[in-house]
């Protein structure tokens, strides 16, 4: 705890403290240093009790993973897209497996774009193959890596929304083994938030350990892996999952878990670009902010201090 000597008008209010570990500024209505320290420690302890911890879980390429599992295939090794081919090649792909994304194919592209990209990849593979010839094809990422003479192929799976809902319900029931329904916020068919503040003492686990245990149980029972974010509020949990987790290596099960609090968010993401990577910041908002010279979350924070009218 550090005592700051501030201008007289502020000091008249009492003794001013900054608690470095908790990042809390406190002005106390006491006049003695001893009583101020006691009071500060009490306030910090109460603040800790009020601090929440949230986990955000996103099932990895959910629709595509379900289709892989139903075909007895590994979702992390199979090239597959979920799209209704009957609607022409301009139909939007609802999901793309991670292995196919690794070739530069977007997760929500149109089917003709996927086919064009695959043609480009196969042209490059043909050029590099022995005798400039491709012999056969494969949908397996591992096989394609080890056998350069094979052409990249992929499966087009028609969407089955009712079936995905059944899978989602099964996974939600796994969540309920660990967290009460009132502490779960269902964000979409493949994504949830959990307030896990009160469960650490119950399970004797950290937030990361609890997230990993839940994800591995889902993987064991359904074959579907996930990414998780941990934060001190919903926004930070979501951003940890959407932004930070994408930049860390997955483990052997394809799991990525990232954490953020207010301090690490400021330290690591205030200069991150583009703004559209952040939850609820679309292209429209981003373009309006850019018109005012605002390009990062740090810019937004600084602008908020000096331009309240905005």
Set out the residue ranges of the language-model regions.
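Short, positively charged and aromatic/hydrophobic N-terminal segments
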Residues: 18, 23-41
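Residue-level detector of alpha-helical transmembrane segments in integral membrane proteins
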Residues: 1-2, 6, 22, 26
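Alpha-helical structural elements
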Residues: 11-13, 20, 49, 57
């Amino acid at each position: 705890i550090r005592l700051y000597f501030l201008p007289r008008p502020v000091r008249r209010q009492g003794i001013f403290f900054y608690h470095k570990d908790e990042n809390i500024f406190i002005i106390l209505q006491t006049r003695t240093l001893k009583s101020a320290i006691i009071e500060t420690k009490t306030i910090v302890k109460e603040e800790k009790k009020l601090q929440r911890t949230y986990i955000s879980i996103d099932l990895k390429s959910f629709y595509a993973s379900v289709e892989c599992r139903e075909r007895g295939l590994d979702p992390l090794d199979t090239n597959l897209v979920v799209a209704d081919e009957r609607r022409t090649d301009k139909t939007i792909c609802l999901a793309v497996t991670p292995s196919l994304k690794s070739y530069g194919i977007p997760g929500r592209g149109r089917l003709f774009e996927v086919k064009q990209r695959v043609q480009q990849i196969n042209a490059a593979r043909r050029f590099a193959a022995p005798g400039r010839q491709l012999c056969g094809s494969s949908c397996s990422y591992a096989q394609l890596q080890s056998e350069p003479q094979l052409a990249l192929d992929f499966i087009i799976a028609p969407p089955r929304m009712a079936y995905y809902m059944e899978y989602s319900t099964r996974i939600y029931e796994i969540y309920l083994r660990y967290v009460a329904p009132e502490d779960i916020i269902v964000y979409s068919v493949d994504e949830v938030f959990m307030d896990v503040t009160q469960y650490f003492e119950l399970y004797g686990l950290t937030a990361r350990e609890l997230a990993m245990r839940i994800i591995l149980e889902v993987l064991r029972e359904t074959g579907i892996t996930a990414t998780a974010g941990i934060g001190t509020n919903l926004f930070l949990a979501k951003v940890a999952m959407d932004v930070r987790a994408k930049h860390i290596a997955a483990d052997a099960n394809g799991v990525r878990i990232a954490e953020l609090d207010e301090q690490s968010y400021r330290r690591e993401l205030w200069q991150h670009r583009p703004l559209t990577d952040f939850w609820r910041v679309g292209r429209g908002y981003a373009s309006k902010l850019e018109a005012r010279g605002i390009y990062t979350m740090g810019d937004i924070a600084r602008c908020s201090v000096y331009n309240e009218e905005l």
